[in-house]
A protein has these predicted regions:
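A detector for small-residue-rich transmembrane helices and their helix-helix packing motifs
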Residues: 1-199
């Protein structure tokens, strides 16, 4: 497995173990809403480092395992194609884009709760995998047979949009997932534009 993918998985697992040992240590590193209203409730307010640190925290073992499996499944192949430096930048941009999206959603909804998880970065990887390996076949939980990666990306994004708009699955940051996907898409477009300009 490529080095950055390995390091990301190791870091997420190690940090999760620290969370389990001392849950309070993770609180200031989760993504909290903008403004002072969170602090007024005796909670932690937004800090700039949370835009990235939240992506290394998880809400439970299943949450962690799902994201790490996806990181292993999609990340390794992508890192080998784009290189470790670009892969790192791409992943972190996806995490950052997901965070910004979630902050906007929380501000509009006027809700105060922390957000954690690597899912924003994972959704960015999912998009890139579908673009770089469109004909590779992957398994989707709701479909009993493998489907092409590009189809998988479209279906999963559509489901996330539906769940986010309808609010039928609470406790999941669906728009943050989509934000990570969009952020990854913008990064890919930037790379493509750079290649075209150099021709």
């Amino acid at each position: 497995m490529p080095p950055v993918t390995t390091a990301l998985i190791a870091a997420n697992v190690a940090i999760y173990l620290l969370q389990m040992a001392q849950p309070s240590l993770a609180v200031p590193f989760a993504l909290w809403p903008l403004g002072a209203s969170a602090a007024s409730n005796g909670q932690v307010s937004f800090q700039v480092w949370q835009l990235l640190t939240y992506g290394f925290l998880h809400g439970g073992l299943v949450h962690l395992l799902f994201n790490m499996f996806a990181l292993y499944m999609f990340g390794g192949a992508l890192e080998q194609v784009v290189g470790s430096r670009r892969f790192t930048a791409y992943y972190l941009v996806s995490v950052l884009a997901a965070a910004v999206t979630q902050l906007l959603v929380m501000a509009l909804a006027r809700e105060i709760y922390p957000t954690v998880g690597a899912s924003g970065g994972v959704f960015g990887l999912l998009l890139a995998y579908g673009i770089y390996f469109p004909h590779n076949r992957v398994y989707f939980l709701l479909v009993p047979f493998p489907i092409k990666a590009r189809v998988f990306v479209f279906i999963y994004a559509a489901i996330e949009l539906f769940l986010g708009v309808t609010g039928t699955q609470e406790g999941v940051a669906h728009f943050a997932h989509l934000g990570g996907l969009v952020g990854g898409g913008l990064m890919l477009a930037y790379w493509r534009r750079g290649r075209l300009l150099r021709r």
